């Protein structure tokens, strides 16, 4: 490209007197071309929006004939105007505030976005929205019906093949081709021309097979709503609604006394809640405002929640969280076929870049929201495991860091499942070492781009089951003048470090605890981690480690080199964001075996300080291999920083004893190599054999262990 530019400049110089004239024409032509492209893109966007509106109008005309189960939208506050959709699904007007609304005010004006299907509406329009959300519980139905809807959300998760009509195989959404507006199914994500729908429904009906993700989607025909449909259920609903409305009235009155109430033409907006019983019976919480007053209403937003501190356009209101928790408690699973293998999803909203809410919405659109759970201080993995307590075969996807994975594995182990569910990982943390080893990627970027999340879910469906060793760490602290003798216990699945690496992790952890809002990016987190490492290069606080720490492996004392500032005990082949410390692929002059995450053996290496860690990161050095063994004891004579799977703490004088605890089932993405496909196929064969009673759960576990050893 630069060569072309230099050639053009030389040609203009050689043109002599005509060069200014030629240059002017080139500039004019470039500006004109950009104007044409801009106009075309704007026209294309307007045309697409008109098609969506046309599809919405067509759906309203035939909605009663579609015979789809009705369901209310699950509205949450959303401040992300830059994200799709940009049009209100009720009034069909833009969701972006007008020019006469200040930028500061527009940031605090929420829209309502459905957490289930992704449509959005003005906060004053949402109460009038049609009950056309996908029904997540349809127990008693013979089959799932297509839930056709206008395509408000531009789903990047749709593969290229879904850009064609499900019935006629003609392209959808291309303005130059004569075609009708399109609908898309909220379950299988297929597209169909509106004009083709009537023909298809007459010929083959409207049964939906859930599309390419049918094996991981929890079918709504097997989900039952627990709340009674009788008087008790109605009274409970009315009671909850009345409590919510009374709280709304009290907040309005309080704001009115302080002069901060939201107003419209000088009047407080309390008329919508003046008669709570009437409001509940009519199913309305806020009356629909007239369109000619919308801008006035948007200007008076002093009582609306502030957008500062919210992540990914998702509101952080407690009422949204409590509503989500109540929503998940309503359901149970019934009549699942014996070979059903639904995917149970756990999302840690605070992991890594705090992308959990955005990912939660995307997964709700692709899967059944009943099978997606958000982990936090109010809800742990038990809620999801309770839902699947009677499901013999299911799989688990953990969206979070290594700490979140350990949390879920602990909860699974406590359940004592006859066939424990294997676990896949969608990495949201900073290091994501276990995710790297299992081939699931190094960060959230693995599901960015066209069709990536859909492809990721399909990879889970075809993943191979492998084993992962879990280790028990017994922490003993000797009694001192300041501290009495104590004994603790933790689990380890990745690595344990003591010395310089743990000190860096400890300082990083303390900073994140003090100011968590500054740690919202994986890239920034790594920069801060590097900053702490650079500081330790100068401090060398762990230079006396060889004299304060001694190592015992399988009952034998192991000498620690005098220049060591850190010891690292490894269970997997990835450390600190992808560093291979044991280096199986290199030749070594020792007699140690290769490293494996399910051989019930640990590896021990040492590092020479933070500078050495930095060189390891970029592949300019190697860690020194010290030992392999099944029982590791680390004796400490003075306080030293320790980290277990990234969780740092200060170890007082005492002993760390690491012993094998057990093995857990993990899902490993099938590689392109023949062995990877063979492992995935063998998993299917073993599961089918167990379903048919040929083998039992314990026999399957033994065979999986042997297969993991030979095919990994």
From Swiss-Prot:
Induction of synthesis: Induced by cold stress. Induced by wounding.
A single GO cellular-component term on record: endoplasmic reticulum
pH-dependent activity: Optimum pH is 7.2.
EC number in record: 2.7.1.107
Protein purpose: Phosphorylates the second messenger diacylglycerol (DAG) to generate phosphatidic acid (PA), another important signaling molecule. PA is required for plant development and responses to abiotic stress and pathogen attack. May be involved in the accumulation of PA during cold stress. Involved in response to freezing stress by modulating the accumulation of PA. Exhibits high specificity for the unsaturated DAG analogs 1-stearoyl-2-arachidonoyl-sn-glycerol (1,2-SAG) and 1,2-dioleoyl-sn-glycerol (1,2-DOG).
Family membership noted in the UniProt record: Belongs to the eukaryotic diacylglycerol kinase family.
Name of the protein described by the UniProt record: Diacylglycerol kinase 2
Gene: DGK2
């Amino acid at each position: 490209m630069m060569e072309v530019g230099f050639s053009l400049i030389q040609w203009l110089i050689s043109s002599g007197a005509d060069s200014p004239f030629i240059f002017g024409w080139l500039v004019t032509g470039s500006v004109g071309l950009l104007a044409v492209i801009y106009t075309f893109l704007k026209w294309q966007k307007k045309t697409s929006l008109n098609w969506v509106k046309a599809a919405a109008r067509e759906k309203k005309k035939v909605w009663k004939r579609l015979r789809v189960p009705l369901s209310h939208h699950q509205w949450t506050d959303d401040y992300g105007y830059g994200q799709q959709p940009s049009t209100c699904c009720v009034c069909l007007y833009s969701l972006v505030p007008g020019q006469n609304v200040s930028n500061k005010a527009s940031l605090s004006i929420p829209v309502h976005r459905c957490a289930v299907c992704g449509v959005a509406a003005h906060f004053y329009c949402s109460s009038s929205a049609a009950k056309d959300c996908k029904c997540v519980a349809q127990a008693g139905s013979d089959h799932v019906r297509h839930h056709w809807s206008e395509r408000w959300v531009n789903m990047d998760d749709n593969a290229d093949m879904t850009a064609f009509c499900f019935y006629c195989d003609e392209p959808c959404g291309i303005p130059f081709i004569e075609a009708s507006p399109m609908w898309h199914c909220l379950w299988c994500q297929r597209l169909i021309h509106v004009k083709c729908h009537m023909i298809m429904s007459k010929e083959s009906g409207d049964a939906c097979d859930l599309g390419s993700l049918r094996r991981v989607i929890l079918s709504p025909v097997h989900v039952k709503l627990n709340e009674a449909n009788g008087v008790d259920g109605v009274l409970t609903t009315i009671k909850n609604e009345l409590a919510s409305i009374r709280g709304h009235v009290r907040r309005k009155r309080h704001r009115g006394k302080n002069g901060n109430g939201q107003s419209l033409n000088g009047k407080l907006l309390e008329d919508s809640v003046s008669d709570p019983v009437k409001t509940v019976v009519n199913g309305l919480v806020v009356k629909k405002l007239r369109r000619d007053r919308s801008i006035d209403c948007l200007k008076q937003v002093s009582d609306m929640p502030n957008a500062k501190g919210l992540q990914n356009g998702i509101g952080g209101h407690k009422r949204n969280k409590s509503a989500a928790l109540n929503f998940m408690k309503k359901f149970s699973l019934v009549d699942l076929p014996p070979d059903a293998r639904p995917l149970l999803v756990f999302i840690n909203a605070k992991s890594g870049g705090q992308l959990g809410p955005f990912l939660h919405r995307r997964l709700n659109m692709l899967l059944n929201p009943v099978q997606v759970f958000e982990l936090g201080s109010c809800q742990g993995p038990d809620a999801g495991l309770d839902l699947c307590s009677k499901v013999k075969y299911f799989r688990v996807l953990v969206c979070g860091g290594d700490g979140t994975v350990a949390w879920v594995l602990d909860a699974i182990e406590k359940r004592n499942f006859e066939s424990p569910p294997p676990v896949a990982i969608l990495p949201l943390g900073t290091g994501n070492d276990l995710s790297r080893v299992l081939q699931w990627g190094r960060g959230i970027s693995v599901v960015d781009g066209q069709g990536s999340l859909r492809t990721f879910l399909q990879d889970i469906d075809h993943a191979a089951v492998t084993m992962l060793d879990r280790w028990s760490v017994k922490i003993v602290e000797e009694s001192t003048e300041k501290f009495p003798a104590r004994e603790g216990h933790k689990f380890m699945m990745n690595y344990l470090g003591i010395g310089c690496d743990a000190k860096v992790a400890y300082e990083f952890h303390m900073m994140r605890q003090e100011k968590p809002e500054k740690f919202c990016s994986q890239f920034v987190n790594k920069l801060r981690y590097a900053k702490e490492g650079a500081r330790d290069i100068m401090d060398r606080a762990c230079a006396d480690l060889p004299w304060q720490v001694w190592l015992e492996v399988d009952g034998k004392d192991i000498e620690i080199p005098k220049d060591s500032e850190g010891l690292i005990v490894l269970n997997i082949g990835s450390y600190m964001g992808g560093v291979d410390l044991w280096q199986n692929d290199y030749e070594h002059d020792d007699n140690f075996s290769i490293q494996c995450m399910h051989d019930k053996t640990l590896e021990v290496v040492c590092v020479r300080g933070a500078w050495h860690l930095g060189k390891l990161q970029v592949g300019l050095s190697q860690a020194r291999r010290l030992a392999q063994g099944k029982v590791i004891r680390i004796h400490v004579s003075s306080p030293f920083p320790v980290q277990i799977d990234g969780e740092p703490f200060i170890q007082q004088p005492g002993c760390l004893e690491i012993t094998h605890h057990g093995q857990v089932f993990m899902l490993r993405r099938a590689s392109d190599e023949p062995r990877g496909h063979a492992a995935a196929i063998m998993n299917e064969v073993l599961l089918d054999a167990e379903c048919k009673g040929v083998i039992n759960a314990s026999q399957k576990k033994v065979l999986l262990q042997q297969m993991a050893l030979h095919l990994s």
